[in-house]
């Protein structure tokens, strides 16, 4: 509602941080997810938008054109703190992208993310060179659909091959930030501890960034304290770090 958007704008104007997750136009019968998402993104001064369409890939899909596992290093912005280590820590590390390779960043029923200003927005997760955007409604029903890439058909291609963004990050005018994702990347199925999808490591990086910084205690004071007390220290470890032998 307009009141909810106004409340979120006030929140971000005061430095609030937002994760916006949207979806594709699949089953968009009663509401337009892209339209609703973009109304909020516009209000808070963001430079990313959700494309009204669906992310597909005929070459590297799983059992459906819109179920993808992004398992290549090139899919991740390894230089950003939110995605740093997500690829190497995930079950995709050391594998080769293939239709039967269900590793990496799990994406199902996602909408593409458009970047309006590349100088202000960083792409965190992107598709393959064979990934593109189309419309669900009116083209197919279920997993039987094999979308035909044809730019000459009006409205068939919403995002060209190789240009699909899945998740972006940008700083907001109020001092906070917004992550714009075309998919809810942290559902229970995406962050299961026994699967090691990249989704879980990205979420962990984000949550760790939100934790308050601990009070740093001088190492000399820690030496004087009783055992089993917890402290935050800064220093350089050279050897025997695990032995806790003060005499070495």
At which residue positions do the language-model features occur?
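An acidic, glycine-rich "communication" segment
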Residues: 24-151, 155-156
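A generic secondary-structure signal marking the coil-to-beta-strand transition
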Residues: 120-122, 175-179, 229
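Extracellular and analogous surface-interaction loops
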Residues: 112-116, 169-172, 237
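Extracellular ligand-binding/catalytic regions of CAZymes and related secreted enzymes
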Residues: 131-214
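Structured segments of extracytoplasmic/periplasmic soluble domains
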Residues: 10-14, 40-47, 205-213
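OB-fold nucleic-acid-binding modules
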Residues: 213-248
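Short alpha-beta junction capping motif
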Residues: 1-42, 175, 181
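Surface-exposed, flexible loop/turn segments at secondary-structure boundaries
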Residues: 26-27, 186, 243
């Amino acid at each position: 509602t307009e009141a909810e958007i106004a409340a979120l704008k006030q929140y971000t104007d005061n430095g609030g941080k937002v994760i916006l997750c949207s979806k594709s136009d699949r089953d968009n019968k009663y509401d337009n997810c892209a339209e609703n998402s973009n109304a909020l993104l516009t209000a808070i001064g963001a430079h990313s938008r959700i494309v009204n369409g669906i992310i597909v890939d005929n070459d590297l899909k799983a059992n459906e054109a819109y179920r993808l596992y992004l398992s290549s290093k090139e899919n991740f912005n390894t230089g950003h703190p939110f995605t740093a280590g997500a690829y190497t820590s995930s079950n995709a590390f050391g594998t080769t992208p293939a239709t039967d390779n269900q590793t990496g960043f799990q994406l199902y029923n996602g909408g593409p993310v458009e970047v309006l200003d590349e100088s202000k927005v960083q792409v965190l997760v992107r598709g393959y060179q064979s990934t593109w955007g189309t419309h669900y409604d009116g083209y197919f029903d279920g997993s039987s659909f094999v979308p035909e890439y044809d730019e000459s058909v009006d409205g068939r291609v919403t995002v060209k091959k190789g240009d699909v963004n899945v998740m972006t990050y940008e700083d907001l005018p109020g001092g906070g930030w917004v992550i714009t994702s075309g998919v809810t990347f942290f559902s229970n199925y995406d962050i299961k501890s026994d699967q090691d999808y990249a989704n879980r490591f990205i979420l962990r990086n984000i949550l760790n960034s939100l934790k308050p910084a601990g009070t740093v205690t001088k190492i000399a004071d820690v030496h004087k304290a009783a055992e089993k007390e917890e402290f935050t220290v800064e220093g350089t470890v050279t050897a025997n770090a695990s032995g806790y032998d003060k005499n070495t």
